[in-house]
């Protein structure tokens, strides 16, 4: 799949040919907080993607995410203006979770993940995220997959989040997750760059005016070059690809 970087004003979502065969398309936005773009994925971009899918397919379209606290995401969807016609809005915490083995025999941190069945039952998977940089690492389409994992299984004590995974080394975990939960397409909403330190809800904003699309690892590499950061999980994914080819 060819990676593309276009001006946001010129962006029209043209789905890859294989999407035409899908009966169920799952879109994973970045929607964990009730704060607008660039903290979360904009409804404008999601609408453009939905329109593009509808032009070539009558597939069921699902939008799914979860909150870092493990609380219901529906009030957050409402706050973000996620109101789409004939699209099923799902809360990851309501899913049935199935343990899926990491295909890497020499995995980095996690041998298997608890994955929502709604992801496994979808035929085409799209990760849609803002352009976020935290200190020296980028949070792009691969890192966006973390909130598909159940807080109930990965929290530590009573606090929310995925603390047990962070303790294993989140960059290694993200590389393992990429192989265990392979997404077909990454879309990075880089109309603005969002730069933050510790709190993903507070940061600085820079205008950039682009939309990036492509295979998640490939497009994240392009985004990391634009941001001038080295993402360890993207390097580990490169090494993992070599392992799978051997």
Each language-model region and where it sits:
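N-terminal and secondary-structure boundary signal
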Residues: 1-246
